[in-house]
Amino acid sequence: MTENYAAVLHGANDVRIEKIPVPEINDDEVLIKIDCVGICGSDVKLYSTGTCGADVIDKPIVIGHEGAGTVVKVGDKVSSLRVGDRVAIEPTQPCRSCELCKRGKYNLCVEPRYCSSMGAPGNLCRYYKHVADFCHKLPDNLTMEEGAAVQPLAIVIHACNRAKITLGSKIVILGAGPIGILCAMSAKAMGASKIILTDVVQSRLDAALELGADNVLLVRREYTDEEVVEKIVKLLGDRPDVSIDACGYGSAQRVALLVTKTAGLVLVVGIADKTVELPLSQALLREVDVVGSFRIMNTYQPALAAVSSGAIPLDKFITHRFPLNKTKEALDLAKSGAAMKILIHVQN
């Protein structure tokens, strides 16, 4: 077995490639030779600020949580995987004993260990261990790159399930970053009849048109919320059944509440502003449901199946690739907003 190298974050804008021990596995775990790892918005937040949500970097930590690789060792109690299996890593290790875990809502576990948080190391390294039942075999026709990129897709499929998207749904997605684009691709696969994406950056909207949007709206900063609502309704020909906030800003959430049709639904999947002022009364009086979505809940297998069947062309979502020793450059590019999905090939 070769040496293990990892991308280790020491603080804001301080990522280093370091040699770390190859981990010893427990009976219920597998050791994975990582092939590639995707860069996510939360990785960028950690890299840029040294914090993400409740996590504060007060000691060095391996980053990365969108990984795929090959099993090279299995624990004594593992029967579902064998050496040589190619797997996508669902980056959580729930406690399995809290009330929410027992109800199947393991994404809301009260004491989870999640990759690249202060509870668990990330997988942007050459060798990584993980609990076997959260490692999913890749279909034969999927690449390792698609296996890594399935992680954000699984997040989005859970979100779209929460949004109750069905055949014929009319959708507006506010924010054409990676999550917004994947929402469009997933909603299209679920049968949405018309999908509009909005953003303040034209290049993102151009990508959205290639990857599932029927129409797009460039939102200029001087537009009022009411002007954005009016333009969405004009493009859609109606008010949307479902409005998805995929950026997390108060302006997007206000527009979502105002534009959604009576008895429709607003899904908030992006979280950026901690406190926002919202026109809730108008939405509640029209029985507009407002729901959130957090991480992944039983959607890795559907995500893998959707990519394997061709329903979601995930390969088109991947735009940039870097070797492990260029992790800083990859994070800087992701920070600039000029890339859709960046993958790091850790064995290079």
Swiss-Prot record:
Polyol dehydrogenase that catalyzes the reversible NAD(+)-dependent oxidation of various sugar alcohols. Is active with xylitol, L-iditol and D-sorbitol (D-glucitol) as substrates, leading to the C2-oxidized products D-xylulose, L-sorbose and D-fructose, respectively. Is a key enzyme in the polyol pathway that interconverts glucose and fructose via sorbitol, which constitutes an important alternate route for glucose metabolism. Belongs to the zinc-containing alcohol dehydrogenase family. InterPro entries: ADH-like_C, ADH-like_N, ADH_Zn_CS, GroES-like_sf, NAD(P)-bd_dom_sf, PKS_ER, SDH-like. This is Sorbitol dehydrogenase. The gene is SDH. It comes from Bombyx mori (Silk moth). Induction: By cold. GO terms for biological process: sorbitol catabolic process. Substrate binds at R295.
